[in-house]
């Protein structure tokens, strides 16, 4: 998957943050608008819900990496290096969606969550296009990763009125906000979101839920490009409007 950077800023951390907020707000509003317009003949009978959650992410190795960094091994550009280690991180997010009364097992959902899987300081070994082999220390790189996903969700409401397992898949937009040597930059990448979980109904409107997510994308940030994947475990509280 070819990932194109949106824009890179020198010392424009403020401008980067403004762009980040605009993109995130636009994505959320568009997805919520879709909930009300995709199925105009049936939305009056839909079961709507919103929820918030928190948890932990456990990223896998950042693989198939190319790196450009003037501080590593005297300076390298477009070098292939070994897999990089990312930090585990706290996760926070919100979601909204609906299920149809006519098809209570099927729904659409929008999900936005954020985490900070910084690149650890580590020794990297690699090679350049001209055949030079090198080893050097890569400094820690701060990374804020926000994901917006548009999901198709399937549940099993007939199994139990109280316990409802579910699962689904969705298209995901990954917003990587990183900084290196005092410079801040934002890049957008495309990927997917797989998830499975269960809801435990407390009242006709309130439910607890636990969920596992698997994310995968090709990210490009701070002159680093590679394949990102992570496993995420979250717990949260959900409100159903039309129960």
Regions found by a protein language model. Give the residues of each.
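Cleavable N-terminal export/targeting peptides
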Residues: 1-47, 242-243
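Short glycine/proline- and aromatic-enriched beta-strand/turn motifs that initiate or cap beta-hairpins
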Residues: 40-100, 232-243
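Gram-negative (and chloroplast) outer-membrane scaffold detector with strong preference
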Residues: 47, 58, 95-179, 230-243
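Outer-membrane beta-barrel translocator domains and adjoining extracellular loop/strand segments
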Residues: 62-69, 119-127, 177-185, 220-227
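Predominantly the C-terminal beta-signal and adjacent terminal strand-loop region
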Residues: 63, 80, 112-113, 117, ...
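Extracytoplasmic loops and strand-loop junctions of Gram-negative outer membrane beta-barrel proteins
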Residues: 74-81, 131-137, 178-180, 218-220
């Amino acid at each position: 998957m070819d990932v194109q950077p949106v824009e890179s800023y020198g010392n424009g951390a403020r401008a980067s943050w403004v762009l980040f907020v605009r993109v995130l707000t636009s994505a959320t509003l568009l997805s919520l608008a879709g909930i009300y317009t995709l199925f105009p003949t049936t939305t009056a009978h839909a079961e709507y819900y919103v929820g918030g959650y928190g948890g932990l992410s456990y990223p896998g190795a950042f693989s198939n990496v190319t790196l450009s960094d003037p501080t590593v091994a005297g300076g390298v550009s477009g070098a292939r290096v070994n897999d990089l280690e990312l930090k585990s991180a706290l996760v926070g997010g919100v979601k909204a969606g609906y299920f149809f009364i006519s098809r209570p097992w099927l729904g659409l959902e929008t999900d936005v969550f954020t985490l900070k899987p910084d690149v650890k300081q580590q020794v990297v070994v690699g090679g350049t296009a001209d055949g030079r082999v090198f080893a050097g220390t890569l400094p820690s790189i701060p990374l804020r990763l926000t994901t917006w996903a548009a999901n198709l969700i399937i549940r099993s409401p007939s199994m139990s009125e109280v316990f409802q397992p579910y699962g689904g898949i969705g298209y995901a937009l990954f917003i990587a906000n990183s900084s290196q040597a005092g410079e801040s930059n934002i890049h957008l990448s495309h990927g997917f979101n797989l998830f499975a979980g269960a809801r435990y109904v407390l009242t006709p409107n309130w439910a607890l839920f636990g969920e596992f997510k698997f994310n995968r994308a090709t990210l490009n940030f701070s002159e680093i490009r590679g394949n990102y994947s992570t496993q995420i475990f979250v717990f949260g509280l959900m409100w159903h409007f039309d129960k």
